[in-house]
Amino acid sequence: TQPLPPACIEAMHKAVEELAGKDTFRGYGPEQGYDFLIEAIIKNDFAPRGIHFSASEIFVSDGAKSDTGNIGDILRHDNSVGVTDPIYPVYIDSNVMCGRAGVLEEETGKWSNVTYMPCTSENNFIPEIPDKRIDIVYLCYPNNPTGTTLTKPELKKWVDYALANDTLILFDAAYEAYIQDENVPHSIYEIK
């Protein structure tokens, strides 16, 4: 861990000063995110990769953990789930809490309605495409906790699987800022 860089400290000082004045205090932001932030995300994160979104398609939230849980509220409770293994625990926990994970199998510690896709040194920590239809697949790349990334052709296999099977991919790109290889997509929207 390193100390905060000067640019961050300067920005935080500026924000504190804004919050200290009656005329510049903002309180809670808009539920979808500030317009200036949404425009900056479109301009700096997606447009350089040739991905075009309108402001109404960008949602700024408080993070993947709550989004992962909340999106499950609009999905059917009997949907099957696929996760890479190992996995960010919230992907499983949120499905357990809403009843989608099925029954816990005591012998294995795994849930009956979850397909676990092993990521091991034998497969270079890249899961095999399932040989059955799964309703919802969670993918996190760069992966937490393995650090593995997928190339565009590897991610395209998942997109093709999803299109062929009417599968929803919940793609968590929380660590995309660490990607330096131009053959590794920062977003699933880079896949044609």
Where in this protein do the model-derived segments appear?
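Generic enzyme active-site microenvironment
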Residues: 170
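N-terminal "arm"/small-domain region of PLP-dependent enzymes with the aminotransferase-like
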Residues: 1-27, 124, 133, 167
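Conserved core of the PLP fold type I
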Residues: 21-161, 176-192
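Walker B catalytic acidic pair
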Residues: 173
